[in-house]
A protein has these predicted regions:
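Phosphate/nucleotide-binding beta-alpha loop and adjacent structural elements of enzyme active sites
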Residues: 1-264
Length: 264
């Protein structure tokens, strides 16, 4: 998007770097709101996103307290009991705690009244419907909306909320295998074509994991080059020491012979 100083909202922000869909925006100078109830990931977000508004809360239909099923060190934590049960059966460790739930419209009322919302992402592992219906899309109009559209950790579609989103004057543009993408009708002419197809071979994109491996390789190669240089310097120093030692030994031998000749 050709937008400078843009504003985003990331509901279910999770890790601020790994697999984050808003990291690139932040790196370009954007800022926004991150909602993440997990203590582990909330700390990471606060450290990595000092310009953002970071809220350790969940989003839902109405204000209140809700049971949160946290699955440590994963992006699978959820407020949906059924989803948590499936993860527990699959062998994941599930920790339960109460968290504060706030409707997304209230969050926007408090923090986004003076901002044009350019991008809204919702990824809450099975509770997307509650988050979306807690938003006032007539008052607050994100240009682009991205919502996780499959059952957690699967490729099975789960989009019961889709008709409601479309009823809020949003056009569906594409499914990338994980998320549904929408554009506000009033922005369709500007952005609809750009979001007609997912990232593909013609984009020349590189997966984040490949970038990370490349960076790790480059760092190791640099370290190896430094170690090789140090080793070469040590070899040169050893050679110099040997030469000095040999010269000293020769001088000592010559002096000894001279002394012997004099004594004779």
């Amino acid at each position: 998007m050709d937008v400078k100083d843009g504003f985003y909202i990331d509901v279910g922000a999770n890790d601020p770097i790994e697999m984050s869909v808003t990291k690139w925006f932040y790196d370009q100078g954007w800022h926004g709101i991150n909602m993440e109830p997990s203590e582990e990931y909330f700390r990471k977000i606060c450290e990595a996103r000092p310009r953002d508004i970071n809220l350790q809360q969940g989003a839902g239909k109405k204000r209140g307290q809700l049971k949160f099923y946290e699955i440590p060190e994963t992006g699978l934590s959820t407020t949906d009991g059924e989803t948590a049960s499936r993860h527990r059966t699959a062998g994941f460790r599930v920790e339960e705690k109460e968290i504060e739930i706030v409707p997304l419209k209230d969050v926007c009322e408090a923090y986004a009244q003076e901002h044009e919302i350019h991008f809204l992402k919702v990824d809450v592992e099975g509770s997307e419907s509650d988050v979306l219906t807690g938003m006032d899309f007539q008052r607050f109009r994100p240009w682009i909306l991205v919502v996780e559209a499959t059952l957690p950790n699967s490729t099975v579609l789960s989009v019961d909320w889709d008709p409601w989103v479309r009823s809020q004057d949003y056009d569906f543009t594409l499914f990338d295998g994980l998320n549904y993408y929408y554009v506000a009708k009033e922005r369709a002419q500007a952005f609809g074509a750009r979001l007609a197809v997912p990232a593909n071979i013609f984009d020349g994109f590189v997966q984040a994991s490949t970038v990370q491996l490349t960076q790790q390789r480059d760092a190791l190669e640099q370290k190896l080059a430094q170690m090789t240089q140090t080793l070469e310097q040590m070899r040169e120093e050893m050679k110099r020491c040997r030469e000095e030692c040999d010269e000293t030994q020769m001088n000592d031998t010559g002096a000894f012979r001279l002394k012997g000749a004099i004594l004779e």
